[in-house]
Amino acid sequence: MKIDIPVKGMTCQHCVDKIEKFVGELEGVSYIGVDLDKQSVQVEFSAPASAEAIEEAILDAGYELG
């Protein structure tokens, strides 16, 4: 499954690295693409990962969904 999540507050490579770290820790995530210009994160995943878990990881990293 592939989802595109709007994320507020990402401004630099450190933000990209932090999102990739938190989301990448979820089992089942196979791809993470962070687009600073569009303020979005694209994630490809399969079970046991879920859209809800990915959104929670982004929130845990300190960013807002939007």
Swiss-Prot record:
HMA domain: which residues? 1-66
Q: Is Metal-binding among the key words of this record?
A: yes
UniProt xrefs under SUPFAM superfamilies: HMA, heavy metal-associated domain
Give an example GO molecular function: copper ion binding
**Record InterPro entries:** Cu-bd (IPR000428), Heavy-metal-associated_CS (IPR017969), HMA_Cu_ion-bd (IPR006122), HMA_dom (IPR006121), HMA_dom_sf (IPR036163)
Residue ranges of the TM segments: none
Judging by the UniProt lineage, the source's domain of life is Bacteria
Please tell me where Cu cation binds in this chain: 12, 15
Q: Which UniProt keywords apply?
A: Copper, Metal-binding
CDD domains in alphabetical order: HMA (cd00371)
Coiled coil segments of this chain? none
An example GO BP is: copper ion transport
Its function, per the record, reads: Part of a cation-transporting system which is associated with copper export out of the H.pylori cells.
| The protein's name | COP-associated protein
